């Protein structure tokens, strides 16, 4: 598996390393144009520590850095090819912090995951080829493509991913090892593993976290569980679904503390 990445000039003039241009452009629209991680009162402040869990190529890392150059970003991405782009982007843009090639969950160790070279944003620990194609079909239709065009694009998409092994860390272990006193924003995008990421935060560490924004796949009551967990730890929580994801299980949860 090659870790060679290409570069793309974004509409804001920044150049990023990427795995494929279509995904990079999608991420730019979501993160820079729509500012999807800064809604419902969520904000970045100078000097914030940001945890980017499921960083992919680091588009949110770059956004946070450009929004407030004084922030420090800890970015986590398990798949080697996106990680190569993530690391290149951190170096190119001199982002303060560090990048780690690992997954985040509720138990440290080593696990196997599925990496999709042609749809890296869907890589993760819960492979489901049929569900993946149905999601892509819905996104295509919601995005304004005709059913014929969507089916043609899906027919060209490989059905299989690559099995890879990755190290796994717990957030509370990272917080302790790095001496993190406060996290201004914890961003999570981990393809159905968000509950396990949050379960890796010990009760004593929750007061350190000011804000959480997570993509949540509402499978087996996940959305309700995540909302309840965050409210239980003192956050004001808003859950919403972007029109692009209408008809899918994907929602976004924004949580913040109303004081401090």
UniProtKB/Swiss-Prot annotation:
Keywords: Cytoplasm, Magnesium, Methyltransferase, Transferase. Involved in the biosynthesis of FK506, which is a macrolide antibiotic with immunosuppressant activity. Catalyzes the transfer of a methyl group from S-adenosyl-L-methionine to the 31-O-position of 31-O-demethyl-FK506. Also catalyzes the methylation of 31-O-demethylimmunomycin, the C31 transmethylation reaction of 13,31-O-bis-demethyl-, 15,31-O-bisdemethyl-, 13,15,31-O-trisdemethyl- and 31-O-19,22-cyclic-hemiketalimmunomycins, which are all structural analogs of FK506. SUPFAM superfamilies: S-adenosyl-L-methionine-dependent methyltransferases. Its cofactor is Mg(2+). Optimum temperature is 34 degrees Celsius. InterPro entries: FkbM_mtfrase (IPR006342), SAM-dependent_MTase (IPR052514), SAM-dependent_MTases_sf (IPR029063). One of its GO terms (biological process) is methylation. Monomer. It holds the Pfam family Methyltransf_21. Optimum pH is 8.5. GO terms for molecular function: methyltransferase activity. It is an enzyme of class 2 (transferase). Its EC number is 2.1.1.-. Inhibited by S-adenosylhomocysteine and sinefungin. This is 31-O-demethyl-FK506 methyltransferase FkbM.
